[in-house]
Amino acid sequence: GGAPAEVNDQQWRNQIRLYEPAEGIYIAPRAPTNNWNLWHEGHIDDLFDRLIENCVMLAGVNPDKVYLMGYSAGGDGVYQLAPRLADRFAAAAMMAGHPNDASPLGLRNLPFAIFSGADDAAYRRNKIAAEWSAKLDDLAKQDPGGYPHRLNIYPGLGHWMNRKDAEAVPWMANLTRNPWPDKIVWHQSGRLHDRFYWLALPAGTAQRGLTIRATASHNTITLDAPGVPRLTLRLHDRLVDLDQPVRVVLNGKTVFDGKVNRQADAILKSLQQRADPHSAATALLDVAEKTGGE
């Protein structure tokens, strides 16, 4: 980042040649700008959404088999993008990057690989790779079943890892996205979003630093959402049995207990938001905190 356009163009051409996966389609996009934060800017999220949609609709790509990886400045972007776009991908691999202010909280359901040369000391990339893996270790201990990850630090190698990091490709190819996980951790950072897995916020209400923890178990959905007075549940029979009553507990209080009807409009609205048929809701339920004597 921050380099002249011709330097970034050359690096882009290098990335095109870097991997030749037999497992599927490999796309190496060029960042739209030459700023220092090439892959951190807000428009990048929209770029990837559109790119994924085009691949699904025009190239027959399975939306549950889409993967994210990036090298150097691209690795910086993976640190940033993977947690906040975790519901789009089946796995992510970060190579030789730096997270800056990224948070790993959103990676609860996204297998995440970290690759670094042991001698890649610039900006402490090697040390921070190990520190981020330790953060994921701690999160996984606190949340069994969550935060799957792996760390590869190659002795004797610096910023260039002699393509050893290519082992990420077959590792990712064996993984499949679950668009309806029974537990979600949604943390707002960088670019704000109003939809994540089976949760949605009213437009314009997302705030940086906001964290929502949601669990679905035995047709009860429990939401720990401090500072969130209302939100929408995007439901599907892969998450709850819509033939049975659904109970919703928001911030410790039951705010709904009853049947939720399947709705064609829910499918339409989901697909209008994102051309991702596997994550399309079949029912929508708006819930709000109870106040006063309610």
Each PLM stretch: what is its role?
Residues 90-173:
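The feature captures the conserved acid-bearing segment of alpha/beta-hydrolase catalytic domains
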Residues 8, 44-51, 74-81, 85-88, ...:
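Stable alpha-helical elements in mature extracytoplasmic
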Residues 5-12, 37-41, 79-81, 103-107, ...:
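Short, solvent-exposed loop/turn and secondary-structure capping segments
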Residues 21, 53-60, 83-87, 137-142, ...:
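Sec-exported extracytoplasmic/periplasmic mature domains
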Residues 3, 7-8, 64-108:
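Primarily recognizes the serine-hydrolase "nucleophile elbow" in alpha/beta-hydrolase
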Residues 137-294:
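Alpha/beta-hydrolase-fold serine-hydrolase catalytic core, especially in secreted/extracellular enzymes
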